[in-house]
Regions:
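Soluble "head" domains of membrane/secretory-pathway proteins
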Residues: 2-30, 50, 56, 64-70, ...
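Hydrophobic membrane-insertion alpha-helices, especially the h-region
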Residues: 32-50
Length: 192
């Protein structure tokens, strides 16, 4: 007894060819999509590491400007001026404070908490209440070379350059200038 093998019809062959081509095209598109996603993720990590670190705010030393839980972007720049908000390394943490004075400049704070930079009263609309806070340095104070005098916006509770525990921030410890808030969405935008 012989087995008879039926030859597939032309229509069946065309359908099988379409199925195989579709499967190959699907695999190709899937592979390309995965490669594109991996590339985008790698570029995002590289950008976040080298140029725009993403940080989260912990604590209340920068209220009302920045609140605990805010997620911010910093820019790695080399120039910082009075009024800029910077992130810097301190005791294996990253702190966020506002620059009050740069290298060689003089800082003075009176009993009411008014801040003077080079004997000029600083206009500080971003603070809610003036306070001398914890201060164990001798005033007026001259900022050393390659360092920045920083203070938190919530002056009463912030531990910053007014304390010898923190002191002035060395330029090499600065992560970058805070430029943009990305979270919460209702406060999304540039940070001043």
């Amino acid at each position: 007894m012989k087995h008879r093998v039926e030859m597939p019809q032309l229509e069946q062959m065309e359908n099988e060819l379409k199925r195989v081509k579709y499967k190959r095209r699907y695999r190709s598109v899937l592979r390309s999509t995965i490669y594109a996603l991996i590339t985008v993720a790698a570029v995002a990590v590289l950008v976040a590491t080298l140029w725009m670190p993403v940080l989260q705010i912990y604590g209340a030393s920068m209220t009302p400007t920045l609140e605990a839980g805010d997620i911010i972007l910093s820019l790695k720049t080399g120039v910082f001026r009075a009024g800029d908000i910077i992130a810097f390394y301190y005791n294996n943490k990253i702190l966020v404070k506002r620059v009050i004075a740069g290298p060689g400049e003089w800082v003075n704070i009176d009993e009411e908490g008014s801040v003077y930079g080079n004997d000029v009263l600083q206009n500080e609309p971003y603070i809610s209440q003036k306070a001398l806070g914890e201060c164990d340095i001798y005033l007026p104070y001259q900022v050393p070379d390659q360092r920045y005098f920083v203070m938190g916006d919530h002056r009463e509770t912030s531990v910053d350059s007014r304390s010898t525990a923190v002191g002035c921030v060395a330029h090499e410890y600065i992560v970058g200038r805070i430029a943009f808030r990305v979270w919460p969405l209702n406060a999304f935008g540039k940070v001043e």
